[in-house]
Amino acid sequence: MDIRNTRQLKDFSAGRLANAREGQKIILYFSLITIAVSAVATVVSYILSQQIAKTGGLGSMGVRSALTTAQMLLPIVQAVFLMCLELGYLSTMLRIARGQYASPNGMRLGFDRFWVLLRCTLLKGLIFGGVAMASMYVAIPIYMMTPLSNSVVDILMPLVKNAGTSGILLDDATYAQLMDAMMPAAVLSGVLSLALAAPVFYRYRMADYLIIDRPATGALAALRDSRVMTKGNRWNLFRLDLSMWWYYAAMLVSIAVNYGDQLLPDLGITLPFSDTVAYFLFFGVYLAVTFVIFYFLRNRVEVTYALAYDSLRPREPENNGAVLGNIFQM
């Protein structure tokens, strides 16, 4: 299998999926669980926010603090659960790509690899966080030394001249103007972040597959081996991503639907119901659209990526697929 031949990868992926008896059942379970977890987390977060709004006074401070903490932890718990589920789903797609039997039970593998997956995710987060910080430190001096910052200087100079002993005081209108004037700096920082993060992203692209394929591997080893595997092939992986444009375009449409309650008023379209109803309405449509995209498209995409991984990994002695879990996880 040649990663440079995207058509060959896709055709082989279609053949593997056609022979996978449990392929549609796997994506059905994965999609339903993902959507159910997202829906429950959103509803619980809304209920918590309503309860927080009802608590007031010193007597309710403890309850309010507990509810606020629960609301803050909820997205973290959701992200960790979906992270494990995602890895388990990828393991089933890797089995299908290799012509091996796979079933929904295989999605438990992500939870079996929880600690190494968590460490790997945290390490990648630190790496990308460092990239973001570096891009910001580069973008701000560029912004300040170019005419892009003139509007900020025009806003700040009168404030500095009139500053008293208490320092510079900003009213809401001035603060809004300052944020608008800083927008070029944010755009410049974002562009630099993308330019710096893209090579890093493709460098560690195969780390999750290595965690699946090698039960004894650690987080650092997975990142290191991924870097070695993708060396010289990052452009080919990028080309493969571009060939999947239809999937990513569909996901962007679903995200736009999720923010429909905010986008439509910005376009001058007034919605005939309250903000809360509009939020949950568009969120429900977003979940439905996401389910359709996952159910009909996700398997094709992930089996193709699994084949790309197999085309890059060094040839090793066969072990009958034991690296993907025991018989009860297949």
What residues fall within each predicted segment?
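Hydrophobic alpha-helical membrane segments
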Residues: 1-330
